[in-house]
From Swiss-Prot:
The keyword Glycosyltransferase does not apply. It comes from the Bacteria. It is an enzyme of class 2 (transferase). Keywords: Acyltransferase, Cytoplasm, Iron, Metal-binding, Transferase, tRNA processing. This is tRNA N6-adenosine threonylcarbamoyltransferase. The gene is tsaD. The keyword Heme does not apply. Belongs to the KAE1 / TsaD family. Binds 1 Fe(2+) ion per subunit. The lineage of its organism: Bacteria, Pseudomonadati, Pseudomonadota, Alphaproteobacteria, Rickettsiales. It comes from Ehrlichia ruminantium (strain Gardel).
C-alpha cells in the first residue's frame, strides 16, 4: 500500500478528440485542469482519427506545460503520472502514453496506465462518499454498458450494446438532420420544443430479459422517416428529436430496471447506480433515469455535468485510486484500442 500522505498526480487524456491534462491531489483538490476540445471535426460530423492524432501532437506539450505551471507545482512535486492507455483511438492513445512515459522516465516517478472507462466510473468517488460495490451505467460516444463495481480494478459486466453506442446514435441522428457535431446537446435542445408523440420509433429489446441494448433499429427508423419527409423544417426537426429522446428514455428505463434487479441478485448490498459518460450530461434523460431509479428504491448519482465528457480530472482521480491500492505500471505497457473494463489486471 502507498503512504496515506497527500499525493499529487499529473494526468493526461488523449483517447478521442479532447486533449486534456490535469493535476489532481488525493484530498480531492484539483490544482489545475486544461481541456481542449478539437473543433476540427465539426465539419465532418464526427471524429476523424488522423485529424485527432495530429491535433494531440500539436496541443499536448503546451497543454501539459500550462497545467503544471497553473497548479503551482513543478515536476519534483508530482508523485505519479496517470495516462489513459485505452480504450480509444490508437493514434491519440500512443501520443498521450509517449508523453507520460517521457515524463516518468525523466523524473523517475511512477506511471499508472488508466482504463478510460475506469476513469469515468471512479470519478463519482471524488464528489460523493460512495462505497463499493455499486452499479454503473456508462453511456458515451464509444460505449454503453452496465457493470458492477466491486472495487478498484474489479468489475463485472451485466450488459452492453449489441451494436451502436448511445452517443454514437445521437451523433448519427444529428447528422441525418444536418444539426452538427456533437449531436447530443443539439438534439436535447431541439427536443424540448417538439412533440414526443409525433413519430413512433422501435424500442429494441424492451421488456426482454437482461440489460443489453440495441440502437441500430432506431437509427434506421429515423433515417427512413427523414428520407420520406418532403419538408424538413424546424418543426419537423424538433418533433423527430423529441420522439427520438422519448424512445431512448423508454429503453433506458426498462434496461435500468432489469440491471438493478440483476445486480441485487448478485449482491443485495448494492443500492446505488452511477450514470456517467458524455450522454449522462443530457438533463432530459437524467430526469427519466432519476424517476426510474427512485421507483426501484435505488439512489442515482451523476458526475458534475461538465465532467461527463472526457477530461483529465477523471484520469487523475483514477490514478489516485489505483495509487492508493499500490497499483502502478511498468514502462513497457502499450496503449490498447480495445480494453474491456472487466479484463483489467492489476499488480502492485
Amino acid at each position: 500500500m502507498v503512504s496515506n500522505l497527500l499525493k499529487v498526480v499529473l494526468a493526461i487524456e488523449t483517447s478521442c478528440d479532447e486533449t486534456a491534462v490535469a493535476v489532481v491531489r488525493s484530498d480531492k483538490q484539483v490544482l489545475s485542469h486544461k481541456v481542449l476540445s478539437q473543433k476540427e471535426h465539426v465539419v465532418y460530423g464526427g471524429v476523424v482519427p488522423e485529424i485527432a492524432s495530429r491535433a494531440h501532437i500539436n496541443y499536448l506539450y503546451d497543454l501539459t506545460s500550462q497545467s503544471i505551471e497553473e497548479s503551482g507545482c513543478d515536476l519534483a512535486d508530482i508523485d505519479a503520472i496517470a495516462v489513459t492507455s485505452g480504450p480509444g483511438l490508437i493514434g491519440g492513445l500512443i501520443i498521450g502514453v509517449m508523453m507520460a512515459k517521457a515524463i516518468s522516465s525523466v523524473t523517475n516517478k511512477p506511471i499508472i496506465e488508466v482504463n478510460h472507462l475506469e476513469a469515468h466510473t471512479l470519478l463519482i468517488r471524488m464528489f460523493h462518499d460512495i462505497d463499493f460495490p455499486f452499479l454503473v451505467l456508462i453511456i458515451s460516444g464509444g460505449h454503453c454498458q452496465f457493470l458492477i463495481v466491486h472495487d478498484v480494478g474489479c468489475y463485472q459486466r451485466l450488459g452492453s450494446s449489441l451494436d451502436d453506442s448511445l452517443g454514437e446514435v445521437f451523433d448519427k441522428v444529428a447528422r441525418m438532420l444536418n444539426l452538427g457535431y456533437p449531436g447530443g446537446p443539439i438534439i436535447e435542445k431541439k427536443s424540448i420544443m417538439g412533440d414526443s408523440k409525433s413519430f413512433f420509433l422501435p424500442r429494441a429489446l424492451i421488456n426482454r430479459f437482461g440489460c443489453d441494448f440495441s440502437f441500430s433499429g432506431i437509427k434506421t427508423a429515423v433515417r427512413n422517416i427523414v428520407v420520406n419527409q418532403k419538408y424538413i423544417d424546424n418543426d419537423f426537426i424538433c418533433n423527430i428529436s423529441a420522439s427520438f429522446q422519448d424512445c431512448i428514455g423508454d429503453i433506458l428505463v426498462n434496461r435500468i430496471t432489469n440491471a438493478i434487479h440483476m445486480s441485487q441478485a448478485i449482491n443485495c448490498k448494492i443500492n446505488k447506480l452511477v450514470v456517467t459518460g458524455g450522454v449522462a450530461a443530457n438533463h432530459l434523460l437524467r430526469n427519466r433515469i432519476s424517476i426510474c431509479v427512485k421507483d426501484n428504491n435505488f439512489e442515482v448519482l451523476y458526475p458534475p455535468t461538465e465532467l461527463c465528457t472526457d477530461n483529465g480530472i477523471m484520469v487523475g482521480w483514477a490514478g489516485i485510486e489505483n495509487l492508493s491500492k499500490g497499483y502502478v505500471s511498468n514502462l513497457d505497457f502499450v496503449p490498447k484500442a480495445r480494453w474491456p473494463l472487466e479484463s483489467i489486471k492489476r499488480s502492485s
